[in-house]
Amino acid sequence: MLRIESEELRVDIKEEGAELHSVFDKTRGQELLWQGGALWKEQAPVLFPFIGRLQGKHYFYNEKKYPMSLHGFARENTFRIVECEEDSCILELRDTAVTRQSYPFSFRLRQEYR
């Protein structure tokens, strides 16, 4: 878990999915982000390369069929830390042999929190 802070906020970020886990208002002593529940355990997932469910859980590109899970795969992958300071953090996910099995494109997805 990564943490960045300002005078007003404390923010926790998961490396898996580069997901915000907590946004805590230090001035009011209050959590500002949904903390999960029985029906939806995530807080603020990064959805890439698709949002939602594809019909049949797949799509076609250049006459080839590719499987795709609900909301894509970014939230299921560990992002690399590019840079992390006291008050900011940049995380990155790049294509791999595994991601190209369901998304046959080169990509670099960066999430930056300040």
Which residues does each PLM region occupy?
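Surface-exposed acidic/polar loop and edge beta-strand patches at domain peripheries
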Residues: 1-114
